[in-house]
Amino acid sequence: MQLFPAIDLRSGKVVRLTQGDYSRMTVYSEDPCAQAREFLAAGAKNLHVVDLDGAKDGTLSNYDTIAALAKQGGLYIEVGGGIRTEERIETYLSLGVGRCILGSVAVTDFDFTARMLKKYGDKIAVGVDAKDGYVAIHGWKEVSAEPGVDFCKRLADAGCTAIIYTDIACDGAMQGTNLGLYRTLAKEVPSVAFTASGGISSEAELLELKKMGTAAAILGKSLYTGALDLARCVQLVQE
């Protein structure tokens, strides 16, 4: 199982939101590149980057930071947040980003998403955020009528091989993740490599996710608060 420590960017700083709420934001570092180097030193091979400004208003205000992270090297980087056009995908891939994560646009413009999956293959992942089992979009403000599992099946049929699935209720809450959910996803949509995201806060959970065949896990707040030690987690999932 792969681990993706997370860097959420707001105005060039490393922050965490609680349950996607911009008014409940904590700044953890003023220097994202230094933070990435810390992760690398702890044995990380991957990095999950979210452009929160992009997600909110579609701007590219964290472009320089993301370019610097990619240039620094050593880590496979996936980027999400505000990626709604092919131009933006090209922009990030040209920086050396490993893959782009499509979020709300996958729900609002499924045809576009299917085209991008066909054209870029494994350079595209889809981020599915679910609230009470239903797909949520636009910074989790709107909830659609489609169950998350059904949406994942549709994505798989369109050629999607990687989905980052977040249970909103768990995200940034440090109360543990929804293990049953990832078990269901692995069983119902076996062709997709799922990344577990949201609320992972114990080594036992990581081991459980690994055991059920989850492809990857994103670690955010648990690393910043010291609840989990990255070097130890890297060791655990490799054993």
Each PLM stretch: what is its role?
Residues D8, F39, L47, Y92, ...:
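Conserved, mostly hydrophobic/aromatic
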Residues S11-G12, Q19-S23, E90, V97-D171:
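Conserved anion-binding
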Residues N46-D64, S104, Y165-Q175:
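Glycine-rich, proline-tolerant flexible connector loops at the mouths of alpha/beta enzymes
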Residues H48-D51, E78, I101-L102, A125, ...:
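Conserved beta-strand positions in the central sheet of alpha/beta enzyme cores
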Residues D53, G58-K118:
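Glycine/small-residue-rich loop that forms an oxyanion/phosphate-binding "nest" at active or ligand-binding sites
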Residues L60-A67, K141-D150, Q175-T184:
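Charged helix-capping and loop-helix junction motifs
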Residues G73, I77-R99, G180-A216:
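Catalytic cores of alpha/beta
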Residues I83, S94-F112, D167-C170, G198-S202, ...:
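Glycine-rich phosphate-binding active-site loops on the catalytic face of alpha/beta enzymes
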